[in-house]
Amino acid sequence: LLKKLMIFAFAMSILSGCSHIKAIDQPQGTLKNNADVVDIHGSVSNLFKMDDFVKKVNEKENVSISISHYTIEGDPIYHNIKYRDGKFELQYDTTQDKFGAGKVTTYSCENFEKTETNTEMKYTLKGCSGEVKSIDVIYLSYDVSRQDLFQFQLKYGDNQANEINTIDMKLVKDLKNGQMLGVSDFQLMNEERQKIYKKMVLSNYLSEKKFATCTEKPDFYLKVKINGAVREYNWSDCTNNEDNKIMTDLANTIIEIVNTRLVENKDL
C-alpha cells in the first residue's frame, strides 16, 4: 500500500506537469462525489477550501477535510484528514478503486504544510507514521514553459470594448474619454505569461463552470487555447456565485498585470 501511495503521488505530479493538457472530462461518478476538494488529474475544484483548512489549523481549531483524486480509470481515491489537538490523522481510502487495495489505511502525522513557487504548489503532511514520512495530498504544476501552446483572448468592460488578445497579438483599451487605445503586435513577457497561467490553473479554468446570470449582458468573455484544448466563457460579475467570483478574480488579475505593464512603459 505504501508503495502504491508513493506511485500514486508520483503519477499525479506527472499528469499535472504534462505538456499536452486536454480539456478535463469528469470521470463517471464525479457528480456524486461529496469530497470538499476534488482533484481530477491535476484540475482541482474548491482549492480555496485547502487554504481555509490551513487557516483553521494555524488557529488551533479542530477541523477536517476530504480530498478526492481520480485514477486514470475514473475511480476515486480519498485523502481524509482530521486535525485534533495538534495532531493530524490521515485516512487513505481506496475502497472505490477497482484496481487498488480496496481498504482504508490510517496514518498519524505531525505537520501540514503548503509550499508554493512560481511553477508549482503542494499541500503536504509531514512526519507521518510508516515508511512514507511526507505525503502530498494536493500537487499542482503550472509551469507555462512546459506547454506547447498557451494563448488567450479576454474581453471586458462596457460592451466588452476592452480586449487583451495574445491569439491575434492585439490590445484594445477604452480610455473613457471617447477614445480607444490600440496596440498591435502585442505580446506578454515570459514573467507575465507565467503569472497569468498560474492564476488560470489555480482558478481551475479547464473545468466546467456553472455561472449565475445577474446582468443582461455578460461583463466578461474569455477564450483560452492550451495545446489541443480550447475553452470559451461568458460571465457576469455576480458576487453570489463561486464560479463567477473565481473567474472575475482571474480576469481582474490579467487586467492588472497588463495595466501595470502599460503604466511602466508609459503607453497610456
Regions found by a protein language model. Give the residues of each.
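Positively charged n-region of N-terminal signal peptides that target proteins for export
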Residues: 1-5
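Internal alpha-helical transmembrane segments of multi-pass membrane proteins, especially GPCRs
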Residues: 7-10
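C-terminal motif of bacterial Sec signal peptides marking the signal peptidase cleavage site
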Residues: 14-17
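N-terminal export/targeting and maturation segments
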Residues: 21-78, 86, 141-190
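Detector for Asparagine
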Residues: 33-34, 46, 58, 62, ...
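Short, well-ordered, aromatic-rich surface patches in folded extracellular/luminal domains
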Residues: 41, 87-157, 214-268
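Charged, amphipathic alpha-helical segments
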Residues: 43-59, 132-141, 146, 189-212, ...
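Short, structured surface segments that line ligand/substrate-binding pockets
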Residues: 53-57, 61-84, 198-239
